[in-house]
Amino acid sequence: MIEADRLIHAEPQGIEERDEQIDRAMRPKMLDEYTGQDDSRAQLKIFIQAAQNRDEALDHMLIYGPPGLGKTTLAMIVANEMGVNIKSTSGPVLEKAGDLAALLTNLEPGDVLFIDEIHRLSSVVEEILYPAMEDYQLDIMIGEGPAARSIKLDLPPFTLIGATTRAGALTSPLRARFGIPLRLEFYNVKDLSSIVTRSANVLELPIDEAGAIELARRSRGTPRIANRLLRRVRDFAEVKHDGEITKQVAELALDMLDIDSEGFDYMDRKLLLAIIDKFMGGPVGLDNLAAAIGEERETIEDVLEPFLIQQGFIQRTPRGRIATDRAYRHFDIIQPEK
C-alpha cells in the first residue's frame, strides 16, 4: 500500500545502511538521555533501581502506544540500565514453539528478551511463554505420536519486554502476566524540539531554536518522524542554503515535502477530505472509508487515525467517523448545518 511510502509514516522503513547507522547514533542509550514520557520514565527509574537493589531480574514489561514513540529504544535503555544483554525478535518471526525455545534457552541470568509486535504471536508460541514468564520454566515436547513426552527445562530469570501498537489485541492471559504496563503518549512540541536539537547535535548539524520548534510542530508528536524529517530538511539546507536549519529553511523544506502546518501529508488530507466531501462530514463506517481512500482498514485504525483523533480532527463514534469543526477550519470549508 502507498502508506509505506509516506515520509511521515511512523513505522520503521527499509532504509540505507548509512541512515540506519544515523538512526542508531541518534537513539538515547540511558534513561537520563531519554526525553519526554515523564510519568513512564519516572516509574521505570524506580522499578529498575528496586530490581538492582534486590539483585533480581526486572519484572516483565509491556510497552504500548502508537508507532514511532520509542518502544524499541526504551527496551534497549532498560537493558543498558540493568547492565544486561538484549535479544530482539518480533511476533510474526516466531512461527513455531521451537523458535521461541531457541531464544529462551540462550538467555543469561537477567537478560532482556524483546518481542516487537507481540500481539501477532501465534497461540502455539504464546502457550510456551506462560510458564516461561511465570515460573522460568520451558515445557517442550520430545518425539512424536505415542512416544511423545513432555520435559521441563529450567530457565534463568529474565525480563520479557513486549511492544505493541494494539494492546487490546493481546489475549487476557498474556496481558495479565506483564507486571509493568507502560503506555507511551504522543510527544508535545517542547519535548519533540529537544529531541530534534539533540539529534542535530549528534549529526553536527547547525539548527536554531525556532527551526527545531518548526520541525517538532510538524512531526505528529512522533520522534521517529521528527528524526526522519530532520534528515530530509538537512539535505534541503545543505543544497539550497548555507547548511543551517532556521525556521524559514524548515518551513520551505517541509512545504516542498508537502507536509502542512499540522504535520499532515497527502494521506491525512485525503482521509479528512473523504469524510467531509464524500460522506458529508460523517458518520462513515471504517470499511466504507477504507474503500473510499484505497487504504487498508488496519492502516487507518492503527496509523492514520490515532493522531487525527488526538488532535481533535476526527471523532470516533458508534455510528462511524465524523469530521470535527477543526477539520473543516483546517481546509477553510464552511461546515454545513445538520
Swiss-Prot record:
GO terms for biological process: DNA recombination; DNA repair. Keywords: ATP-binding, Cytoplasm, DNA damage, DNA recombination, DNA repair, DNA-binding, Hydrolase, Nucleotide-binding. Its EC number is 3.6.4.-. SMART domains: AAA. Residues 4-187 are annotated as: Large ATPase domain (RuvB-L). It is found in: Cytoplasm. Residues 261-338 are annotated as: Head domain (RuvB-H). It comes from the Bacteria. The keyword Glycosyltransferase does not apply. SUPFAM superfamilies: P-loop containing nucleoside triphosphate hydrolases, Winged helix' DNA-binding domain. GO terms for molecular function: ATP binding; ATP hydrolysis activity; four-way junction DNA binding; four-way junction helicase activity. The RuvA-RuvB-RuvC complex processes Holliday junction (HJ) DNA during genetic recombination and DNA repair, while the RuvA-RuvB complex plays an important role in the rescue of blocked DNA replication forks via replication fork reversal (RFR). RuvA specifically binds to HJ cruciform DNA, conferring on it an open structure. The RuvB hexamer acts as an ATP-dependent pump, pulling dsDNA into and through the RuvAB complex. RuvB forms 2 homohexamers on either side of HJ DNA bound by 1 or 2 RuvA tetramers; 4 subunits per hexamer contact DNA at a time. This is Holliday junction branch migration complex subunit RuvB. The lineage of its organism: Bacteria, Pseudomonadati, Pseudomonadota, Gammaproteobacteria, Alteromonadales. The gene is ruvB.
